[in-house]
Amino acid sequence: MSQAGQSSRTITLEEALEQLSLLESQLNQLQATIREIEVRIAQLTAVEDALASLAEGAEDALIPLDGRGTVLVPASIKKLERILVHAGLNVFVEVDREKALEYLRDEKAALSKLLDAYSREYARLAQYYSALRSAIESALQAAPPQAKSQQSQQ
């Protein structure tokens, strides 16, 4: 890439520190989102595994009444022929087992693509954050002692 295609702009130390802070916030938000997506993918995998193992039904099962499994009730599960799948906006659709599995796989694939995009963006921002932080540290070390003391007082 030519130098003419890149713009060069000098920023103040204060602007660099502000950018560093904003980048840190963005990195934290991206990291939290990445974790949420990873958890959701793991949940979908667990549901897919459960549907596979319960295909023929089960004599004894424990069904959680809440998301954390704090309260469980014993149950028997019939052969899984029709399953209710959340279609969005609090709408559930009754589908056969294969269609439910297809839905789960499609959702996992979409989330995996999103996870990949967010992970690449996180890596890009982390690299920029590291470079900016190094530049700030170099500037602070190169600053005259008087400027350093003024900076630390702010």
From Swiss-Prot:
GO molecular function: unfolded protein binding
Compartments where located: Cytoplasm
Xref: SUPFAM superfamilies: Prefoldin (SSF46579)
Cellular component terms (Gene Ontology): cytoplasm; prefoldin complex
A biological process term (GO) from this entry: protein folding
Main location: cytoplasm
InterPro entries referenced in this protein's UniProt entry, alphabetically: PFD_alpha_archaea (IPR011599), Prefoldin (IPR009053), Prefoldin_subunit_alpha (IPR004127)
Family: Belongs to the prefoldin alpha subunit family.
Purpose: Molecular chaperone capable of stabilizing a range of proteins. Seems to fulfill an ATP-independent, HSP70-like function in archaeal de novo protein folding.
Protein name, as recorded: Prefoldin subunit alpha
Organism: Hyperthermus butylicus (strain DSM 5456 / JCM 9403 / PLM1-5)
Taxonomic path: Archaea, Thermoproteota, Thermoprotei, Desulfurococcales, Pyrodictiaceae
